[in-house]
């Protein structure tokens, strides 16, 4: 769905035709009418204006907030029990907003950020070490922005700690590049933000939910005391299953990691307060 109905129809037709050659019999439809949501079990929200070079994700809040509110009203009317996956930026704030107006539990409304941030970090680790990205495990928590918290002691290559291969200085460079990964792409493309990697990240989460795979993936979830925080949406490791977000996994953090997480949470809390004031 898109406010530009014919654009959505064209993209849907293109995807449908691509799916045929991959052996899929799924029919793909597009349009602008909210009635298309009727009976949906899972809705992914990506609508909104992209940020421009030099802007933060929070800079597009005033524009994207009313867009999200309109979509949530349509979802509540046509698919009130649907699981909602928020991707629009600023994703932490908009996930919180979507949950707060949905009338549903946190298991049914959550966001995508950490899967993408983790993929970026794995890409940079593979580039730096020369090893296959398939053998790299990584984890990113916190807000989706410069305050995100890559947990480097959980990063491994083929079950070997990352610190065995890279110096602390090299690891810190990867951390900083991961935090600014979206901005790097935005600066290079000039006229648009990342789309392919976010699309793959969304597909992973949708697959986990639609097929009940019980996958552990980072998601922007509403915290209810986990990691010492409440009434906030933050990126944390979650179990995604058939009904949505089955549970949050609370990892033990050392003092430095907890301090970084708290710093990130404080920033997200300020952003949410700004949203409430609009």
From Swiss-Prot:
Catalytic reaction annotation: (S)-malate + NAD(+) = oxaloacetate + NADH + H(+)
Family matches, as InterPro entries: L-lactate/malate_DH, Lactate/malate_DH_C, Lactate/malate_DH_N, Lactate_DH/Glyco_Ohase_4_C, Malate_DH_type3, NAD(P)-bd_dom_sf
Keyword Protein transport (UniProt): no
Biological process, per Gene Ontology: lactate metabolic process; tricarboxylic acid cycle
Active site: 144 (proton acceptor)
Sequence positions that bind substrate: 51, 57, 89, 120
EC number: 1.1.1.37
Disulfide linkage: none
Signal peptide (UniProt feature, chain positions): none
Entry binding sites for NAD(+): 64, 87-89
Highest taxon, organism lineage: Bacteria
Keywords: NAD, Oxidoreductase, Tricarboxylic acid cycle
Molecular function via GO: L-lactate dehydrogenase activity; L-malate dehydrogenase (NAD+) activity
One Pfam family of this chain: Ldh_1_C
CDD domains listed in its UniProt record: LDH-like_MDH
Family membership: Belongs to the LDH/MDH superfamily.
Biological function: Catalyzes the reversible oxidation of malate to oxaloacetate.
NCBIfam families xrefs: PRK06223.1
Database matches in PANTHER family: L-2-HYDROXYCARBOXYLATE DEHYDROGENASE (NAD(P)(+)), L-LACTATE DEHYDROGENASE
Identification of the protein by name: Probable malate dehydrogenase
Organism: Pseudomonas putida (strain ATCC 47054 / DSM 6125 / CFBP 8728 / NCIMB 11950 / KT2440)
